[in-house]
Amino acid sequence: MATLEQLRFDNTYARLPAGFGARVHPSPFPDAKLVSVNPAALKLLDLTPEEAQRPEFVAAMGGAKPLPGMEPFAMVYAGHQFGVYVPRLGDGRALLLGEVRDAAGAKWDLHLKGGGPTPFSRGGDGRAVLRSTIREYLCGEAMHGLGIPTTRGLGILGSQAPVYREAVETGAMLVRMAPSHVRFGTFEFFHYTEQTEHVATLADHVITEHFPQLAGQEGRYARFYTEVVERTARLIAQWQAVGFAHGVMNTDNMSILGLTLDYGPFGFLDDFEPGFICNHSDDRGRYAFDQQPRIGLWNLACLGEALLTLISEDEARAALATYQPAYNAHFMDRMRAKLGLRETRDEDRELVSDLFARMAEAHVDYTRFFRALGHFASADGADTRPVRDMFPAPEGFDAWAGRYRARLAAEGSVDAERHARMTRVNPKYVLRNWVAQEAISRAEAGDFSLVDRLLGVLSDPFAEHPDAEPYAAAPPTWGRHLAVSCSS
């Protein structure tokens, strides 16, 4: 294991030509202190939890005393926000502290969120609030536990300093990790400002660092774009399969590596509601749960437009044409796994569609249903009450269950083996908004024990965790269908 002082920085992004961002001196909270740390993320940097308890950890990660090799840097980008192009955004309250090479040679961005104003703050204070910091910290680990590509939180630095939003809130900073923070909107910025040489420089940088098999190859830009299309299709299929709504799928929130990026007004489904809107600012439902696959394609088309100085229109169209088949294949693979099916059959799509229609009509809890379905007894006449009782009118479930039973029999499914498979892919725990709010309320009162407890539970969401059972329950009345603000 390493010490802080042994971290190896290789700041490739900060070494790009002028115009990719701005070097910034962080303005951390003077009373910043470590209030939660993620041991699993520390391990990626070869650091121990004990190393994080050193005062130097807070000073370095909070930006007060950067480590040798750190070069705090705010990245510039643009983006389509709710379908409207905004020509200049950038890291308004975030900083790339530096890029660390781990012992295996993998590279990790260390990103500080809430470290004060930057040239891209657009009049804002550059701060983050504890509420949104906890939500992002926990959801990053929840998504990682679910096997979904994501940024991850290294730790939360708390403060007593007030931050002024719609109300006065408690300030905090998040130390975030990811292989890269390059976005679709990064390419858009250089394209629409007609800096075509920077579009090529950025593409070559991303290819060299993250798609090295394409470096120097003929046709590399078209192949790169096709790979981004594939990764994005896979990511959104994974979101849909676990019932995750991002809430603000602007192109500046889309990762070029297919990571879940920028957790804001997200939400996991409680009842299965295809049109679920988790962002209360999304009055037209542009980013509703069932619109995410369509928006993924729209965003990729925006990226393709930004790459047209590197690829032809025919190459862009060919890459985009792979999106829907890739999405469909990934989504159905996930749904077959959730249903415990081993074989691929033509009728599977209809089986899933029929189930979804019945779940939506009956307002069945999405996560709890699939977890319980693992215990479905497939023998004719077997007791199916644990799942059946989730439907107010059980006859609707019975009709689907007959088809499901026949489908299981057709591939010779064995209940015990199927149960084991389904338990590995259907989580017991997701970060429901009401659970996050409970952790936030306690933390705002100075108690971070639930934040730490949930971090552990969500990192292993398929296990039973008997002492966390209340957080697998259906939400209380006050916690149903919560919509969340973009304010952070």
From Swiss-Prot:
It is an enzyme of class 2 (transferase). Keywords: ATP-binding, Magnesium, Manganese, Metal-binding, Nucleotide-binding, Nucleotidyltransferase, Transferase. This is Protein nucleotidyltransferase YdiU. Its cofactor is Mg(2+); Mn(2+). It comes from Myxococcus xanthus (strain DK1622). NCBIfam families: PRK00029.1. InterPro entries: SelO. ATP binds at G90, G92, R93, K113, D125, G126, R176, R183, D262. It comes from the Bacteria. Nucleotidyltransferase involved in the post-translational modification of proteins. It can catalyze the addition of adenosine monophosphate (AMP) or uridine monophosphate (UMP) to a protein, resulting in modifications known as AMPylation and UMPylation. It catalyses: L-seryl-[protein] + ATP = 3-O-(5'-adenylyl)-L-seryl-[protein] + diphosphate; L-threonyl-[protein] + ATP = 3-O-(5'-adenylyl)-L-threonyl-[protein] + diphosphate; L-tyrosyl-[protein] + ATP = O-(5'-adenylyl)-L-tyrosyl-[protein] + diphosphate; L-histidyl-[protein] + UTP = N(tele)-(5'-uridylyl)-L-histidyl-[protein] + diphosphate. The active site is at D252. Belongs to the SELO family. Mg(2+) binds at N253, D262. Its EC number is 2.7.7.-, 2.7.7.108. Pfam families: SelO (PF02696). One of its GO terms (molecular function) is ATP binding.
